[in-house]
């Protein structure tokens, strides 16, 4: 019987099957950061338990760490306590890898794991963070979990899960100039909606997806949760294997050969049946910009802000009206006439070396517009930062008027010093544009790194295809 990739991943990890369709699944990799782990470790201690398999753990602080003035430490007392608690917990119990604050390898977990080869095809990967779906780029069954589940995985190395339906999102054809994985992700969400993937595990396929680099695939899978799906993944191919070879925690020698032989089975079989299939033409996808307070509120950069009056569904119409009021926008305003205040290039969605190269290629020889108050470039990890500096990208950003920062989650979310002030509008390469996501009253527009760079130069949203 032909199987989907999801079928294979699920069946390979079932420890016990319940009659109601739920199953106890074994967890291969547990990623831990400072925000969702303190209560879990405390629960273990109160119960007199120890972690079941510390060799599954990869940990680093990322949400609360500052991205500048590291010599001053972490000023906010709550943030400092969370980071210090993570440090104490991991030093007590151990881990496969721990990259503490100021370690040259620290950074955003969803960047650090893959670049170190700690995310390998066929794994189940969990983390107390909703964007764990990023790791699905490696044909992993990866998803976010809550704090109580973090404790459960620490104690048992298992999770009780209900099987999802399957969806294939196929993007066929060749992407045009200036169109990136981020644009593909936003176009998909704009097509299926933020609830379109609810209850599904999404496999991304098609010639355009196969043409993406691993970093592009990570961007795509990172956004799966924004389409309602806990899981998003891409089948293994030569691109996957070539990326992993020689990474610190990748297998070596004969073990590598055996691993590769297994990894090459991690694809949907010919004739495998999906519960839903969605197909997009790559040629139809243009650079995207969100206009509202949900990732599904997105249009092409050459479009206008939608008019709620044209929406027949009263619930959707009301949501659009509220979003426009919060965002301070009027219907039918051309996207390329919307001025910005700040620019953020970073986050677990778009802070890898290819993202920084992409933005730098637009910025080189140009400068941030006078109306832009702040432009941040925040590498996703210390390793990415060092690579970018070796290539001279930091000099390009600084010459263009950007601040070149230390690694961390930064302005993706208002849990550290990098945030928007009320009413400020930001071109952001992050993954969520909810009300207050980047700071109370802040207005977030999601774009690709290239589009963020183009907006920084113009002082408003601009079509990056015109400057490439």
Swiss-Prot record:
Pathway: Amino-acid biosynthesis; L-leucine biosynthesis; L-leucine from 3-methyl-2-oxobutanoate: step 2/4. Its cofactor is [4Fe-4S] cluster. SUPFAM superfamilies: Aconitase iron-sulfur domain. Transmembrane segments: none annotated. It comes from the Bacteria. NCBIfam families: leuC (TIGR00170), PRK05478.1 (NF004016), PRK12466.1 (NF009116). This is 3-isopropylmalate dehydratase large subunit. It comes from Dechloromonas aromatica (strain RCB).
